[in-house]
């Protein structure tokens, strides 16, 4: 019942225009009433600035608009093998949209595998505002990525995407939280924020190109905040949800897509 109420509020937020969706690689707080962002350390180098997300089709080598025959489908099905990692395998780890994978994800996967962090920032052509992956061919990009991983001695590529959904609920104290008190101002929590995170991971076998995609459990939480600390509270909640989702993603990868559990 509690979860139903929370996500009913999210639905209401959609209708009222106060719901927001942010990628995990660009998760700074934006004040919905002022359209201003609360940021942590400022990004001064354009090389690591957020430029959008990697396309799942490009990472997996799925060619859009290409003619495919039934025989090709049957042959691919016959040759397909389950993607299975082994203890100590080397992983080229990519967080879509980020120059570096987040530290909690690296830490979670490093317990069982060798992790090589790799950029997930798509190249943006100077002539266009959209990401440009080189040739514009998904299969070509995927093979280039596999070649880069192979040259680095990596057995697998793991790329992950994530989004944070949030909705704000005004508390009854909203109208009085701005009233000054002797020596204090805005001391009453006046807003409740509901947030959840969704994560998706793709595993690509560097040698064969076989791949699998899965999503771990979704996590959600709710926090109250005051106006002066809204941005800071938001970022604390973001980092906590990220950590929980990363740990769940790493756990599912080990349990569902590796033989580590059977060797322990």
Model-inferred region functions:
Residues 1-7:
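Bacterial N-terminal signal peptides that target proteins for export
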Residues 14-17:
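C-terminal motif of bacterial Sec signal peptides marking the signal peptidase cleavage site
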Residues 82-167:
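N-terminal segment of the mature soluble domain
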Residues 19-22:
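Bacterial signal peptide processing site
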Residues 103, 170, 211:
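Short acidic, gly/pro-rich beta-turn/loop elements at beta-sheet edges
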Residues 24-80, 164, 188-198, 204-264:
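C-terminal/domain-edge helix-coil "capping" segments
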Residues 135-206:
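Surface-exposed short loop/turn segments
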């Amino acid at each position: 019942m509690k979860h139903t109420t929370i996500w009913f509020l999210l639905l209401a937020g959609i209708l009222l225009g106060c719901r927001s969706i942010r990628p995990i690689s660009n998760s700074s707080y934006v004040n919905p009433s002022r359209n201003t962002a609360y940021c942590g350390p400022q990004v001064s180098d354009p090389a690591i600035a957020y430029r959008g997300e990697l396309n799942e089709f490009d990472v997996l080598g799925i060619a859009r608009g290409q003619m495919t025959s039934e025989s090709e489908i049957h042959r691919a099905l016959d040759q397909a093998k389950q993607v299975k990692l082994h203890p100590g395998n080397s992983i080229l780890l990519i967080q879509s949209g980020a120059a570096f994978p987040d530290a909690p994800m690296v830490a979670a996967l490093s317990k069982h595998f060798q992790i090589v962090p790799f950029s997930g920032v798509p190249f943006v052509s100077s002539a266009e505002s959209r990401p440009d992956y080189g040739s514009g061919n998904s299969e070509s990009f995927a093979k280039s990525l596999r070649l880069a991983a192979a040259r680095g001695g990596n057995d697998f590529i793991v790329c992950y995407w994530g989004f944070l959904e949030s909705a704000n609920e005004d508390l009854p104290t909203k109208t009085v939280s701005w009233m000054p008190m002797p020596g204090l101002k805005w001391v009453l929590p006046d807003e409740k924020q509901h947030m959840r995170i969704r994560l998706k991971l793709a595993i690509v076998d560097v040698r064969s190109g076989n791949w699998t995609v899965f999503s771990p459990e979704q996590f959600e939480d709710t926090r109250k905040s005051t106006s002066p600390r809204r941005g800071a509270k938001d970022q604390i909640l973001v980092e906590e949800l990220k950590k929980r989702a990363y740990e769940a993603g790493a756990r599912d990868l080990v349990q569902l897509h590796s033989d580590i559990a059977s060797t322990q």
